């Protein structure tokens, strides 16, 4: 299997983002976004997904973090789509349950070529380390729309909002790792009865 890494840049009047992902990495992470708690969460994705991430972002944080968080999700999703390529020989589906003390989250995903997000997390407070918890949805929506995956996120229980968020991102990393893992039994075959996992919206 060829090298599965990609770099994407996104420049708008609101943000300037550069994201690099290596799907066959070792969990290395270099982040410079101006958003410490989001960086803490992305570090969990890298370490638990065994992907290397290098993300640099400048945005209109003097307004709020919405544009920057959403655009990081978009740019990382685009890089992921480029890195994973035609998806031949991968497992396609990934899932993970991750606990952290009282919190438990489940993430299930499909490299379907059809973007879809179902996220059910009732955070116990509105801000974690100064980060608006509503923006987690914006990050994942941006990622899903451009990675072209179906993603289900459920926080099954939790009292501490930090623990809720951390279990979600750890489970996301582990589910990604499972989905993109090469399956030796597939031997370069696309894991779909249609023979393609394209962006046409009808892959099964």
Curated annotation (Swiss-Prot):
Pathway(s) per entry: Amino-acid biosynthesis; L-histidine biosynthesis; L-histidine from 5-phospho-alpha-D-ribose 1-diphosphate: step 6/9
Domain of life the protein comes from: Bacteria
Keywords for the protein's UniProt record, in alphabetical order: Amino-acid biosynthesis, Cytoplasm, Histidine biosynthesis, Lyase
Organism expressing this protein natively: Alcanivorax borkumensis (strain ATCC 700651 / DSM 11573 / NCIMB 13689 / SK2)
Name of this protein: Imidazoleglycerol-phosphate dehydratase
Entry-linked InterPro entries: IGPD_sf, ImidazoleglycerolP_deHydtase, ImidazoleglycerP_deHydtase_CS, Ribosomal_Su5_D2-typ_SF
Enzyme class per UniProt: lyase
Stretch list, region Disordered: 183-204
One GO CC term, this protein: cytoplasm
Record localization: Cytoplasm
Disulfide bonds: none
Molecular function terms, GO-annotated: imidazoleglycerol-phosphate dehydratase activity
BP terms from Gene Ontology: L-histidine biosynthetic process
EC assignment: 4.2.1.19
Biased amino acid composition, Polar residues: 190-204
PANTHER family the UniProt entry points to: IMIDAZOLEGLYCEROL-PHOSPHATE DEHYDRATASE (PTHR23133:SF2), IMIDAZOLEGLYCEROL-PHOSPHATE DEHYDRATASE HIS7 (PTHR23133)
Pfam families linked to this entry: IGPD
Catalytic activity entry: D-erythro-1-(imidazol-4-yl)glycerol 3-phosphate = 3-(imidazol-4-yl)-2-oxopropyl phosphate + H2O
Family note: Belongs to the imidazoleglycerol-phosphate dehydratase family.
